[in-house]
Every structure is written in structure tokens, then in C-alpha cells.
Swiss-Prot record:
RNA chaperone that binds small regulatory RNA (sRNAs) and mRNAs to facilitate mRNA translational regulation in response to envelope stress, environmental stress and changes in metabolite concentrations. Also binds with high specificity to tRNAs. Homohexamer. InterPro entries: Hfq (IPR005001), LSM_dom_sf (IPR010920), Sm (IPR047575). This is RNA-binding protein Hfq. NCBIfam families: Hfq, PRK00395.1. One of its GO terms (biological process) is regulation of DNA-templated transcription. The gene is hfq. Belongs to the Hfq family. One of its GO terms (cellular component) is cytosol. One of its GO terms (molecular function) is RNA binding. HAMAP family: Hfq. It comes from the Bacteria. Residues 10-70 form the Sm domain.
Length: 88
């Protein structure tokens, strides 16, 4: 079985996007914005707040603060279920 590569940044942003969790994004210049992560790629994050969209370059981001706790790692039970599914 090949070891699954774990990309923390992509996983974090994808959970925020799929669960539509509100975030505060702090930029390196001190500016901050709030909204929902709508999309992201290797270089940018698209934040939506109301009817306003903001495309932010990742190199300009200092901190992303989600409104709720994000479970990044799979629990042992989820890992076991995945292994069983792969064996079938």
C-alpha cells in the first residue's frame, strides 16, 4: 500500500471550503478580512463575504483563523475503515 501524501495547507483550506466555515484572514500588511473560502489554488485563496469577493495571494497571508475547530488528522477509527476498504 502506497503511503498517502499529506498536504496540510490544502487539507485545511479544503475543509474550510467544503464546510463553509467563516474565517478571518490576516495579511502581512496588517489588513484583515472575514468571509468564506470559496476556492483556492497553489498561489491564491478566494474569500467571499456577502456579495464581495476578494482574491488574496497566499504569500500575502500571515494567518487564517477559522470560526471553529478544524479536525485535520483522521481518527484511528477512520484510518482503520480506510484500510479495510482498500483491502476489499
Amino acid at each position: 500500500m502506497a503511503k498517502e501524501k499529506f498536504n496540510l495547507q490544502d487539507r485545511f483550506l479544503n475543509i474550510l471550503r467544503t464546510k463553509k466555515i467563516e474565517v478571518k484572514v490576516y495579511l502581512v500588511n496588517g489588513f484583515q478580512t472575514k468571509g468564506i473560502v470559496r476556492s483556492f489554488d497553489n498561489f491564491t485563496v478566494l474569500i467571499e463575504s456577502g456579495k464581495q469577493q476578494t482574491l488574496i495571494y497566499k504569500h500575502a497571508i500571515s494567518t487564517i483563523l477559522p470560526a471553529e475547530y478544524i479536525m485535520l488528522m483522521k481518527t484511528e477509527e477512520e484510518q482503520q475503515e480506510q484500510q479495510e476498504a482498500e483491502q476489499e
